[in-house]
């Protein structure tokens, strides 16, 4: 990643970037600092490292190298920004590298995780599979194994909407994936296989809930053995062996690796979102699940966040999570109306969902058998 003779900067200053800085520093790599296009809400110093706006960076070494620790669809744009400032050595962070580095770092920190063999019984390394998936050449496809998974009751619901930009790469061609139009009650049909405004639904809450309207719909209306949620441009790259573990009960859920937050999850969240929303969420937990209120605060005072609202789980676990989650969000909606001005796309419940996802999973690590798998971005 760096030959040791150049300054290494991490481009980005949010969770992906901070996690990679933690992982690299833990194994002895020197990191010169973070670089962002515009500072926005980013702090001036992040975990002891300076955060520079690219226009303010004073590094006369044109050979300095940059790790682009942001979603892949931003890599080309950032390469152009760097080139405009005279920097031409940039490496985009790919899913395989992120998964390898963060797995090692989290394992070293004692983060609990149930692991399958490195090759999942396939003879192909996890890194190779993640890299191939990112290149749109792996993940379950319409072959015999994927057909068997579908026949066994595995369904991954892909939240998509009319606002989604076109992608160069398609989702994996697999019968386990089903596109679902999110917020279908509020927008024209887009040709998705399914809609979230059928049956029992909160489709009209989509401006505040984003993909969680699809999660709710899958909870209330689908009866699969294994349910999962993916997004139009990202998904969890699970292997057949990991789906098999869900089906035979040796695992309960597949999750992305958690992000590392600084100085803690609550502070990082509030840096980019309304602190009032976090306060309303804690009040809702105290009202709906009072026995978990103290635990929730303790978890958000820690460093880990499960992001993206993506999971794949046995139906009993998926449904239990939803039965826990949605009453909290309903309480926030009912008791904090100022967070939801009319005719706005606030995404408040969608963002709070990520905090609640983290609280639910981390607080149940001693009861649930959790597997962590790579997330893949489509571009």
Regions found by a protein language model. Give the residues of each.
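ER/Golgi luminal nucleotide-sugar-dependent glycosyltransferases, focusing on the catalytic module
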Residues: 108-379
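Short hydrophobic segments within beta-strands
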Residues: 10-11, 35, 69, 157-159, ...
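Extended catalytic core of nucleotide-activated donor transferases of GT-like folds
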Residues: 20-22, 53-55, 71-80, 140-145, ...
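A short, charged/proline- and glycine-enriched loop
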Residues: 3-7, 64, 149-155
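Glycine-rich adenosine-cofactor-binding loop
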Residues: 4-24
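A residue-level structural signature of the nucleotidyltransferase/glycosyltransferase Rossmann-like core
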Residues: 8-9, 66-67, 234, 309-310
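Phosphate-bearing ligand-interacting subdomains
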Residues: 39-128
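Short internal beta-strands
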Residues: 32-38
């Amino acid at each position: 990643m760096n030959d040791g003779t150049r300054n290494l900067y991490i481009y980005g200053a949010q969770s992906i970037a901070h996690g990679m800085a933690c992982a690299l520093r833990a194994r002895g790599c020197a990191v010169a600092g973070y670089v962002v296009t515009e500072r926005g809400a980013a702090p001036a110093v992040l975990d002891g490292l300076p955060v520079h706006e690219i226009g303010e960076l004073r590094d006369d070494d044109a050979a300095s190298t940059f790790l682009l620790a942001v979603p892949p669809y931003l890599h080309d744009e950032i390469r152009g920004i760097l080139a405009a400032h005279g920097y031409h050595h940039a490496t985009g962070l790919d899913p395989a590298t992120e998964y390898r580095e963060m797995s090692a770092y989290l394992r070293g920190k004692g983060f609990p995780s149930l692991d399958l063999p490195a090759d999942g019984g396939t003879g192909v390394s996890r890194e190779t599979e993640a890299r191939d998936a990112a290149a749109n050449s792996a993940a379950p496809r319409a072959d015999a194994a994927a057909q068997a998974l579908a026949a066994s009751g595995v369904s991954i619901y892909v939240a998509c909407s009319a606002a989604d930009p076109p992608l160069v790469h398609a989702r994996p061609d697999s019968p386990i994936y089903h596109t679902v139009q999110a917020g279908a009650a509020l927008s024209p049909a887009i040709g998705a296989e399914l809609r979230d405004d059928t049956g029992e639904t909160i489709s009209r809450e989509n401006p505040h809930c984003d993909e969680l309207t699809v999660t709710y719909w899958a909870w209330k209306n689908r009866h699969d053995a294994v349910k999962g949620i993916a997004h139009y441009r990202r998904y969890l790259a699970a292997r057949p062996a990991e789906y098999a573990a869900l089906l035979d009960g040796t695992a309960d859920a597949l999750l992305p690796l958690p992000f590392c937050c600084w100085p803690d999850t609550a502070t990082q969240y509030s840096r980019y979102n309304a602190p009032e929303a976090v306060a309303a969420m804690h009040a809702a937990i105290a009202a709906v699940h009072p026995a978990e209120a103290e635990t929730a605060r303790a978890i958000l005072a820690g460093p880990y966040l499960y992001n993206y609202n993506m999971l794949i789980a046995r139906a009993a676990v998926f449904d239990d999570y939803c039965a826990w989650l949605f009453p909290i969000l309903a309480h926030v909606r009912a008791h904090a109306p100022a967070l939801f001005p009319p005719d706005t796309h606030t995404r408040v419940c969608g963002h709070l969902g990520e905090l609640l996802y983290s609280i639910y999973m981390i607080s149940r690590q001693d009861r649930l058998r959790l597997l962590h798998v790579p997330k893949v971005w489509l571009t």
